[in-house]
Amino acid sequence: MLSPKKTKFRKEHRGRMKGRSSRGSRISFGKYALQALEPAWLTSRQIEAGRRAMTRNVRRGGKIWVRIFPDKPVTVKPTQTRMGSGKGSPEYWVAVVKPGRILYEMGGVAENIARKAIEIAASKMPIRTQFIISK
């Protein structure tokens, strides 16, 4: 599971996901990619599940790049706790994904293999995505 080694602050505001992704929306490493079409928080578990699915599908061939990193802590209060008495403790990490963001890239394999592997990874994601090919 991905998580930052060290952060400046333990807890963060939730924030908003307005507009499209300004950075990380072009293919820069591989030839094929999975692009987000909706805004969402992707947990480190979801990112890892997608990566494992792709790796398992291409077996020994090709290279995979994970283009997102979960750097936002999500806090959760214990169950049966009354309101107030501060913010909960950090439970898991999420990556804030806006529409247009590249999630995974792949290279060194045939298009049909890449398409199959990326579609399996896409099924693990909680958002609509699309398969794209670099020009």
From Swiss-Prot:
One of its GO terms (biological process) is mitochondrial translation. It is found in: Plastid, Chloroplast. Keywords: Chloroplast, Plastid, Ribonucleoprotein, Ribosomal protein. One of its GO terms (molecular function) is structural constituent of ribosome. Its main location: plastid. Residues 1-23 have a biased composition (Basic residues). Gene3D superfamilies: Ribosomal protein L10e/L16. Residues 1-24 are annotated as: Disordered. NCBIfam families: rplP_bact. HAMAP family: Ribosomal_uL16. Part of the 50S ribosomal subunit. Belongs to the universal ribosomal protein uL16 family. This is Large ribosomal subunit protein uL16c. It comes from Pelargonium hortorum.
